[in-house]
């Protein structure tokens, strides 16, 4: 059995002017040769912790400075196991993080490395759900959307409460 690789993905969003989250996806060539959309991701290097891996990989793959991103929370983990010994497949434990980007999405750029060929900067929830091939990733996107919207509701409740006190 091959070693299990630890990796981290960043489900990255920024808030649009209409207060709806917009997601960042990367386009790449899949092993099948088709173009797929994925979240920025990568492997742990050295003694790096999983959150630092997520921030570093998103920064490396999109050009977003680490200081313009904030991990909101861990969304979940999956175990990917290669039971058929397919070429290019490896055993991985993947940790997913919801990350907020506070900068201008116009400045996000793709690095033409690791097979990446482009970027989608402003995907709505429905666009992401239509573009993402993998069901488990679509579920994480749905979960992230609920977390973001619940956070907005909580902020509105706090503002209303403070206004009533004043």
Which role does the model predict for each range below?
Residues 1-40:
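N-terminal strand-loop-strand
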Residues 15, 102, 146:
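Residue-level marker of positions within ordered structural domains that often coincide
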Residues 19, 63-64, 150-153:
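A generic secondary-structure boundary signal that marks alpha-helix termini
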Residues 33-34, 47, 144, 148:
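A periodicity- and composition-biased signal for non-globular, repetitive helical segments
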Residues 34-38, 118-119, 142:
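A short, polar/proline- and glycine-enriched secondary-structure boundary/capping micro-motif
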Residues 36, 40, 46, 84-86, ...:
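Functional cleft and adjacent loop/helix regions within the main domain
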Residues 43-139:
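Unchanged
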Residues 132-166:
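Charged phosphate-binding loop/patch that engages nucleotide di/tri-phosphates or the phosphate backbone
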């Amino acid at each position: 059995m091959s070693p299990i690789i630890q990796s981290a993905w960043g489900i990255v969003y920024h808030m649009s002017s209409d207060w709806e989250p917009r997601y960042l996806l990367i386009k790449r060539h899949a092993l099948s040769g088709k173009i797929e959309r994925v979240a920025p991701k990568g492997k742990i290097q050295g003694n790096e912790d999983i959150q630092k891996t997520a921030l570093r990989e998103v920064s490396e793959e999109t050009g977003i400075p680490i200081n313009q991103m904030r991990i909101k929370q861990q969304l979940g983990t999956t175990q990917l196991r290669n039971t058929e010994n397919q070429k290019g497949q490896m055993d991985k434990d993947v940790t997913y993080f919801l990350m907020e980007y506070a900068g201008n999405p116009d400045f996000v750029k793709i690095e033409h490395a690791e097979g990446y060929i482009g970027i989608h900067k402003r995907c709505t929830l429905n666009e992401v759900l239509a573009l993402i091939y993998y069901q488990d990733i679509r579920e994480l996107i749905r979960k992230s959307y609920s977390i973001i919207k619940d956070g907005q509701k909580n902020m509105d409740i706090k503002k209303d409460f403070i206004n009533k006190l004043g």
